[in-house]
Structures are given as structure tokens and as C-alpha cells.
Amino acid sequence: MKLQEIKDFVKELRGLSQEELAKKENELKKELFDLRFQAAAGQLDQTARLNEVKKQIARVKTVQAETKE
């Protein structure tokens, strides 16, 4: 992801409720699980997508922590 895409993603996250953030986190975790499965089977072409999804999950958790305060 490029810097502007990251900023837009975080801006979008900040507009979501806690329930929507939890749903987004679950979707990303499911995608990460699927990507790991593909990587183990040797079918994953975009290996960088693994790290990208991990970082997106971290961003979601950060925004969740910000809004809980």
C-alpha cells in the first residue's frame, strides 16, 4: 500500500463504530487465514499480501484502542 492509500484506509476506519471495526478485523483475520493456507500449499502468488493484511489488522486494532478511550 502506498502512503495515501494507508491514510485513506485509516480515515475510513476512524469513521466506523466499534461493531463495524470488530467485523472488519474478523474479515481481515479470515483473509489472513486463507492466505496462510495458500502459502502452505504453495499456491500463493502475492506473498507481500500476507504482511499487508497483518498491518491492516494492526491498524484496525489501533483505531479500536483510540476510540475506546
UniProtKB/Swiss-Prot annotation:
Pfam families: Ribosomal_L29 (PF00831). It comes from the Bacteria. SUPFAM superfamilies: Ribosomal protein L29 (L29p). Belongs to the universal ribosomal protein uL29 family. The gene is rpmC. This is Large ribosomal subunit protein uL29. GO terms for molecular function: structural constituent of ribosome. The keyword Ribosomal protein applies. GO terms for biological process: translation. PANTHER family: 60S RIBOSOMAL PROTEIN L35/50S RIBOSOMAL PROTEIN L29, LARGE RIBOSOMAL SUBUNIT PROTEIN UL29C. Keywords: Ribonucleoprotein, Ribosomal protein. GO terms for cellular component: cytosolic large ribosomal subunit.
